[in-house]
A protein has these predicted regions:
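Short, Asp-centered acidic motifs that coordinate Mg2+ and/or phosphate
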Residues: 25, 61-62, 152, 186-188, ...
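Active-site metal-binding loops of divalent metal-dependent hydrolases
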Residues: 30-32, 67, 157-159, 191-193, ...
Length: 280
């Protein structure tokens, strides 16, 4: 009998330890929209404070960004707890748009980091396949949650908006790189994929099975609109879902939402951020 009670006590102790060691995390993806005067009243100087207040109010712990120039990222870093990893897509340093990962530096430590381009030669800045506009980049890092000691990977991407072949090949390259770098570890993968779920590039990801669409496994009903692109218009159809958060199989998604925040009729970006609350 003593052995039985000792066994039960050990099981309970392990359960309690597992719960205490659980990492709860708020993850998001947010296309910030590049800073251009062509946006007029929607240009970055007129909305950067809205972006910062949204991030603070929804308590993002870590989030992938797209389109941000260095000065836009620096504006967000005025929130003292944040830092970022990621390089400019034009020169691998600071020039051009970034696919930066912004993270709470008081909570997470960067263990590894890297970048690759969506191109035939992923190691150097350049356009890939049938892309004609821009270099496209993926930035990634391995993080350690300092309180629990748990580690995880985070990948953040921005696919081409014109080249159909480029988007398809980008999905193949993303999966190839993630399998090589991540292995069986916990991960989050965010981005503006410029592709809807039924399209070829996304079907490559779904059929592979490594990346789990957080919306499809959320324990609670998804919040917000189906679409994530709004064109700075409150009356836009908001049907095009092109921004995603994928997770590894060991991640529990407590809730998923597309955040349709606006202030006085203005929207912080031409994309809505997508957010999940998750645990692992």
């Amino acid at each position: 009998m003593k052995e039985f009670f000792a066994f039960v006590f050990s099981c309970l102790a392990l359960c309690v330890y597992g719960q205490k060691n659980m990492v709860n995390i708020c993850v998001a993806t947010y296309n910030l929209r590049m800073d251009t005067p062509n946006d007029k009243e929607d240009a970055w100087p007129n909305r950067k404070e809205m972006v910062k207040s949204l991030v603070l109010f929804h308590e993002f712990d870590i989030f992938g960004t797209q389109e941000g120039f260095k000065h836009q990222l620096d504006d967000i870093l005025e929130i003292d707890k944040f830092a970022y990893i990621g390089v400019g897509r034009d020169d691998g340093k600071d020039a051009g748009e970034h696919s930066a990962i912004i993270y709470d530096k008081t909570r997470f430590t960067v263990l590894e980091k890297g970048d690759f381009w969506y191109a035939e030669n992923p190691e150097v800045p350049g356009k890939g396949w049938d892309a004609t506009c821009c270099n496209r980049i993926c930035s990634w890092a391995k993080f350690k949650d300092t309180s629990s000691g748990k580690e995880f990977y985070f990948f953040n991407s921005h696919y081409d908006h014109q080249g159909e072949i480029a988007r398809l090949e980008s999905s193949k390259l993303l999966l190839e790189r993630m399998k090589k770098i991540v292995g069986n570890s916990t991960f989050f993968c965010t981005g503006d994929f410029n592709a809807t779920p039924e399209s070829g590039p996304m079907q490559v990801i779904y059929k592979d099975g490594m990346l789990i669409d957080s919306k499809l496994v959320s324990k609670t009903a998804p919040y917000g609109t189906e679409g994530t692109f709004n064109s700075f218009k409150l009356d836009a159809p908001m049907k095009s879902r092109i921004d995603y958060i994928f997770v590894s199989k060991d991640v529990t998604v407590e809730k998923y939402g597309v955040l349709n925040d606006s202030q006085y009729g203005r929207i912080p970006s031409d994309h809505f951020p997508v957010m999940i609350v998750a645990s692992f």
